[in-house]
Swiss-Prot record:
Name under which the protein is recorded: N-acetyltransferase ats1
Function: N-acetyltransferase that may act on a wide range of D-amino acids. May also acetylate histones, polyamines like putrescine, spermidine and spermine, and certain other small basic proteins like nuclear HMG proteins.
Gene (UniProt): ats1
Pfam (any one): Acetyltransf_1
Site (Important for catalytic activity): 136
The family this protein is said to belong to: Belongs to the acetyltransferase family.
Disulfide bonds: none
Enzyme class of the recorded protein, top EC level: transferase
GO molecular function: diamine N-acetyltransferase activity
């Protein structure tokens, strides 16, 4: 392991962020679901003038080469009335796995959550990704029993939006 550092994503990194997204989608067997574009990432990360970022990202680098990435956003708990961090994606390239880089990224985000007054770090993991589950449990994460992730997309999202009466 050479020189290792974690740093924030900058605008010039967006092609690499996009590449990581495609690599993650391939790993998760979801390549056909990637709709991301570099212009959309510019907006999401707030790299367009007067646009508030809705996503943040960090790279872990080995010898100045991107080895892994975490993309996250702020969330809020009504129960604690505190901000937190939701980890959207964590990906370590295959040749860099087994070096603790995923754990370092989790620790970085835990520190960031505490820095902003947060009380937790949330994410979901594919149920077949046993290696990741083991890393997360070793880091102190627990499965949240009794909860199921829900999602509305595409035509169902439009249909749901259309159910709201026009006077709203």
């Amino acid at each position: 392991m050479g020189s290792v550092r974690i740093r924030s994503v900058i605008k010039e990194d967006l092609p690499t962020v996009y590449q990581f997204i495609k690599e993650l989608a391939e790993f998760e067997k979801c390549e056909d679901q990637v709709e991301a574009t570099i212009p959309n990432l510019e907006v999401a990360f707030g790299f367009i003038d007067e646009v508030t970022p809705v996503a943040y990202g960090v790279f872990i680098e080995e010898n100045d080469q991107p080895a892994g990435m975490a993309i996250y956003f702020l969330n809020f708990s009504t129960w604690t009335s505190r901000v937190g961090i939701y980890l959207e994606d964590l990906y370590v390239r295959p040749q860099f796995r087994g070096k603790g880089y995923g754990s370092y990224l989790l620790s970085y985000l835990a520190r960031e959550s505490l820095r902003i007054g947060g009380r937790r770090l949330d994410w979901v993991v594919l149920d077949w990704n046993q290696r990741a589950i083991e890393v997360y449990e070793k880091a102190g994460a627990q499965k949240v029993g009794g909860w199921s992730m829900m999602r509305v997309t595409g035509e169902n999202l439009k249909a749901l939006a259309d159910k709201l009466p026009g006077n709203f």
